[in-house]
Amino acid sequence: YLVNPAGYAALGAYMFLLILIGSPVNFLTLYVTLEHKKLRTPLNYILLNLAVADLFMVLGGFTTTMYTSMHGYSVLGRLGCILEGFFATLGGEIALWSLVVLAIERWIVVCKPISNFRFTEDHAIMGLAFSWVMALACAVPPLVGWSRYIPEGMQCSCGVDYYTRAEGFNNESFVIYMFIVHFLIPLSVIFFCYGRLLCAVKEAAAAQQESETTQRPEKEVTRMVVIMVIAFLVCCLPNASVAWWIFCNQGSDFGPIFMTLPSFFAKSAAIYNPMIYICMNKQFRHCMI
């Protein structure tokens, strides 16, 4: 054991809790939306995509991590490590790029940079395809030799190798690519869209261009999406910051707990999206009841 066995027991219990909550709430989101036709709107397609991404993380990654935490090391071997790292990365990236699509949708609908534009089912499907292509562009390269998935922290979960400069894997170039293309760029797009959105909402309120009844539904949807983005940042920024620090300070003395806690905290992302959606979407709650 790299740390006290009680630490592994705590991680195992934490992962069990995430599975216990994450599986039913995400399945509930999928079931209720697919069961009720009035919930099958273009915007909800993207929210369904978030639920699918969360299920990838819960079923493909968390179950493996819980099992290895109970044993105190990567007991499933190289293949198990690769699968866990792949599903965790894929699910996290689908969620991030889905938030990008949601941000762009909110910007176009509220700010109207393109006159007479309606976000239709075709646009939603294009957004879904885009989020999957970008997520696969991040999760697949370590499977084929550009970087690799290795045990990290307390050795009971796996992720991209930003710890070493192992020969033949080009870890440095992949980590830089991942941070720029799959972290900084999507965050920049999200911040741009919500920056413009905030300005537009203030201008509309000041000029009273629209009635309160017209503005209210858009405000509620926008508020829900903004809270999802904030929750994502709270969960994932610590993990990304620690990963970048380790990458830039390879060889420095840092313990397994320092590497593990932000990573496991980020995994809670799999339960907050559906809970925000359920709590803040009145129409969904009515259909659920």
Swiss-Prot record:
<protein>
    <recommendedName>
        <fullName>Rhodopsin</fullName>
    </recommendedName>
</protein>
<comment type="similarity">
    <text>Belongs to the G-protein coupled receptor 1 family. Opsin subfamily.</text>
</comment>
<dbReference type="GO" id="GO:0016038">
    <property type="term" value="P:absorption of visible light"/>
</dbReference>
<feature type="modified residue" description="N6-(retinylidene)lysine">
    <location>
        <position position="267"/>
    </location>
</feature>
<dbReference type="Pfam" id="PF00001">
    <property type="entry name" value="7tm_1"/>
</dbReference>
<dbReference type="InterPro" id="IPR001760">
    <property type="entry name" value="Opsin"/>
</dbReference>
<feature type="topological domain" description="Cytoplasmic">
    <location>
        <begin position="33"/>
        <end position="44"/>
    </location>
</feature>
<feature type="transmembrane region" description="Helical; Name=6">
    <location>
        <begin position="224"/>
        <end position="245"/>
    </location>
</feature>
<dbReference type="GO" id="GO:0097381">
    <property type="term" value="C:photoreceptor disc membrane"/>
</dbReference>
<keyword id="KW-0716">Sensory transduction</keyword>
<keyword id="KW-1133">Transmembrane helix</keyword>
<feature type="site" description="Plays an important role in the conformation switch to the active conformation">
    <location>
        <position position="84"/>
    </location>
</feature>
<keyword id="KW-0844">Vision</keyword>
<feature type="transmembrane region" description="Helical; Name=7">
    <location>
        <begin position="258"/>
        <end position="279"/>
    </location>
</feature>
<keyword id="KW-0449">Lipoprotein</keyword>
<feature type="short sequence motif" description="'Ionic lock' involved in activated form stabilization">
    <location>
        <begin position="105"/>
        <end position="107"/>
    </location>
</feature>
<feature type="transmembrane region" description="Helical; Name=4">
    <location>
        <begin position="124"/>
        <end position="144"/>
    </location>
</feature>
<dbReference type="GO" id="GO:0016056">
    <property type="term" value="P:G protein-coupled opsin signaling pathway"/>
</dbReference>
<keyword id="KW-0564">Palmitate</keyword>
<keyword id="KW-0297">G-protein coupled receptor</keyword>
<keyword id="KW-0807">Transducer</keyword>
<keyword id="KW-0966">Cell projection</keyword>
<dbReference type="GO" id="GO:0008020">
    <property type="term" value="F:G protein-coupled photoreceptor activity"/>
</dbReference>
<feature type="transmembrane region" description="Helical; Name=5">
    <location>
        <begin position="174"/>
        <end position="195"/>
    </location>
</feature>
<comment type="function">
    <text>Photoreceptor required for image-forming vision at low light intensity. While most salt water fish species use retinal as chromophore, most freshwater fish use 3-dehydroretinal, or a mixture of retinal and 3-dehydroretinal. Light-induced isomerization of 11-cis to all-trans retinal triggers a conformational change that activates signaling via G-proteins. Subsequent receptor phosphorylation mediates displacement of the bound G-protein alpha subunit by arrestin and terminates signaling.</text>
</comment>
<dbReference type="InterPro" id="IPR000732">
    <property type="entry name" value="Rhodopsin"/>
</dbReference>
<feature type="glycosylation site" description="N-linked (GlcNAc...) asparagine">
    <location>
        <position position="171"/>
    </location>
</feature>
<dbReference type="GO" id="GO:0007601">
    <property type="term" value="P:visual perception"/>
</dbReference>
<feature type="transmembrane region" description="Helical; Name=3">
    <location>
        <begin position="82"/>
        <end position="104"/>
    </location>
</feature>
<feature type="topological domain" description="Extracellular">
    <location>
        <begin position="145"/>
        <end position="173"/>
    </location>
</feature>
<feature type="topological domain" description="Cytoplasmic">
    <location>
        <begin position="280"/>
        <end position="289"/>
    </location>
</feature>
<dbReference type="InterPro" id="IPR050125">
    <property type="entry name" value="GPCR_opsins"/>
</dbReference>
<dbReference type="GO" id="GO:0005502">
    <property type="term" value="F:11-cis retinal binding"/>
</dbReference>
<feature type="topological domain" description="Extracellular">
    <location>
        <begin position="68"/>
        <end position="81"/>
    </location>
</feature>
<dbReference type="GO" id="GO:0016020">
    <property type="term" value="C:membrane"/>
</dbReference>
<feature type="transmembrane region" description="Helical; Name=2">
    <location>
        <begin position="45"/>
        <end position="67"/>
    </location>
</feature>
<feature type="topological domain" description="Cytoplasmic">
    <location>
        <begin position="105"/>
        <end position="123"/>
    </location>
</feature>
<dbReference type="InterPro" id="IPR000276">
    <property type="entry name" value="GPCR_Rhodpsn"/>
</dbReference>
<dbReference type="InterPro" id="IPR027430">
    <property type="entry name" value="Retinal_BS"/>
</dbReference>
<keyword id="KW-0597">Phosphoprotein</keyword>
<keyword id="KW-0325">Glycoprotein</keyword>
<keyword id="KW-0675">Receptor</keyword>
